[in-house]
Amino acid sequence: DPEMSRGLGDVYKRQGHGWLINQFLSPMFNKRTDEYGGDLTNRMRFALEIIENVRQKCGPDFILGYRLSADERVTGGLTIEDTKAIVPYLDQAGVDYFSISIAVNATDDQMIPSMYYRHGYQADYAKEVKDVTCKPVITVGRINDTRIAESILRSHKADLIGFARQSLTDPETPNKAREGRFEDIRKCVGCLHGCVGHIDTGLAGSCELNPLVGHESDPEYQTVPAEHPKKVMVVGAGPAGMQAAIAAAECGHQVE
């Protein structure tokens, strides 16, 4: 099949947030009157057929992950109680792990949280899902501090933590945490400007706090040691000033 022929060892079905399979599951979207609509058993049919087909073609060792909107946070949509009824069927059909988020496009402020949401605010939904499956459960949602992530894991609300925007802001987050360099971690501030904001308007994704995003292999953005190091004074402590200080120091200049 296509995935296996490309040498992949897993596939991740992102089917929350109003995407196709989610539309079949959700009573808000699904108005069909055939065997794929109506009660929960019928609304699950499409998802289960896809999972069973992938499992049949890719074999038992192929890892299959599944993203769910545990609660669509909209009137008439899926609730966490619906999801707790659905997950055991997906589990039995062959899903290896679940990635739990919330919301759909109509409630996208909760789906892609800004700085006004508390860190790890979706973890309680992951805990609800963990109660009905033995498979690993991932939580997401404004988690930009590895110590917060660790507290979620220790409280058994999730088995794994998903860093999305935080991985853009500082790809070295896990390594710095492993080395105990917590204060060196550059944290996503949840501004939604360079990442979601740019992509939604057709621009290339970026990050307000990490200018290398999208330019990782661009020679103009690479650090080159200065032939004649100088003393450099940076006036201003905003993102631009801080990055200027970092770049100058990495080039070997003495920054004040």
Name each model-derived stretch.
Residues 171, 177-229:
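Cysteine-cluster motifs in flexible loop/terminal segments that predominantly coordinate metals
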